[in-house]
Amino acid sequence: NCPEDYFTLIMRRMMMRISERLARNSGSLALITGESLGQVASQTLPALVTTDSVTNMPVLRPLIGMDKEEIIKISRDIDAFETSILPYEDCCTVFTPKHPKTRPTLSACEEAEKSLAVDELIEKAVNGTEFSVIE
């Protein structure tokens, strides 16, 4: 129920809302993501600003200025690379628009979200959360 070119951004805004709720419930003080500036349409500066506008928590992005090769090297160093390349479907692969917005506006995102039951969807997601401890 929203413009296709905003699918990814709206999903990311929903993920940030859900993440903030879960973080606050667990006593966390910030959100941490693995984004690298400009690697994909949803990681341009305008897209990140639009995504971050739904949270009041700090969003830490330790990889923000690194290129893909640097990130791959780090993932190998911490034994995360093999897991990171496992095939699976996620919202970014299933719902990727043909022409995603690279310079979104906050007002357009907010307008597109008006047709969604945002609070209800967040509540449902938070209540359905399962936690796993990875050692």
Predicted regions: what they are:
Residues 2-78, 121-134:
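Active-site adenylate/phosphate-handling loop in enzymes that bind or generate adenylated species
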Residues 40-42, 68-72, 84, 93, ...:
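Short active-site-adjacent structural elements
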Residues 79-87:
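A short alpha-helix-loop-beta-strand transition element characteristic
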Residues 86-135:
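The feature marks non-catalytic terminal segments
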